[in-house]
From Swiss-Prot:
Pfam families: BTB_2. GO terms for cellular component: cytosol; nucleus. Homopentamer. Interacts (via C-terminus) with GRASP55/GORASP2. Interacts with CUL3 and with ubiquitinated proteins. Interacts with CRY1. The lineage of its organism: Eukaryota, Metazoa, Chordata, Craniata, Vertebrata. Residues 213-234 are annotated as: Disordered. It comes from Mus musculus (Mouse). Residues 44-146 form the BTB domain. This is BTB/POZ domain-containing protein KCTD5.
Length: 234
């Protein structure tokens, strides 16, 4: 008797969709898709195509919130305009990176956000999918974060810049990125052959930096770096 051999699919792209194809053969994967579309078949599994990344989850997970977009999607709401791709996955034009925390919240009821993701981004997705409990949870998390940052000590960074009189106006007028003028000290004049004496000044500037669990709230911009470099030439 001839043996049947499965041709394994390559692993799916990275993200929460990983594992969707890897480990399944082409024939078995196609069979699962066909069964999911048959009446009385394996209909508890739902495939989503979010911004080009595939997610596989259960209908029960997506139906956690009866008022959500995903619940209506599973109920085949006629008022909901939804398309499917060639694999039968529901097409959702959203950021797949931020869909991960939303889907995991529906799975186990806990909000887990990687440190490289912004709470505001998760909130935007929660509002799009209309998941009421998640919206409240993320808003509370944002308020706690802002309150924690406001209570952290503020560091003042000072820089001393040396410049001539003709450079002073331009330097002060172009200062930005949080740098503030503090003090101007005259240090006399320098003599240039063939030119008149040039008055020289020390310009003291400062900037506030708020500490956060992941460092300061902002990295120095190009203009701030220029100020630092000029100050270091003294």
């Amino acid at each position: 008797m001839a043996e049947n051999h499965c041709e394994l699919l390559p692993p799916a792209p990275s993200g929460l969709g990983a594992g969707l194809g890897g480990g399944l053969c082409r024939r078995c994967s196609a069979g699962m898709g066909a069964l999911a579309q048959r009446p009385g078949g394996v209909s508890k599994w739902v495939r989503l195509n979010v911004g080009g990344t595939y997610f596989l989850t259960t209908r029960q997970t997506l139906c956690r919130d009866p008022k959500s977009f995903l619940y209506r999607l599973c109920q085949a709401d006629p008022d909901l305009d939804s398309d499917k791709d060639e694999t039968g996955a529901y097409l959702i034009d959203r950021d797949p990176t931020y869909f991960g925390p939303v889907l995991n919240y529906l799975r186990h009821g806990k909000l887990v956000i990687n440190k490289d993701l912004a709470e505001e981004g998760v909130l935007e997705e929660a509002e799009f999918y209309n998941i009421t409990s998640l919206i409240k949870l993320v808003k509370d998390k944002i308020r706690e974060r802002d309150s924690r940052i406001s209570q952290m000590p503020v560091k003042h960074v000072y820089r001393v810049l040396q410049c001539q009189e003709e450079e002073l106006t331009q330097m002060v007028s172009t200062m930005s990125d949080g740098w503030k003028f503090e003090q101007l000290v005259s240090i006399g004049s320098s003599y240039n052959y063939g030119n008149e004496d040039q008055a020289e000044f020390l310009c003291v500037v400062s900037k506030e930096l708020h500490n956060t669990p992941y460092g300061t709230t902002s990295e120095p911009s190009e203009k701030a770096k220029i100020l630092q470099e000029r100050g270091s030439r003294m």
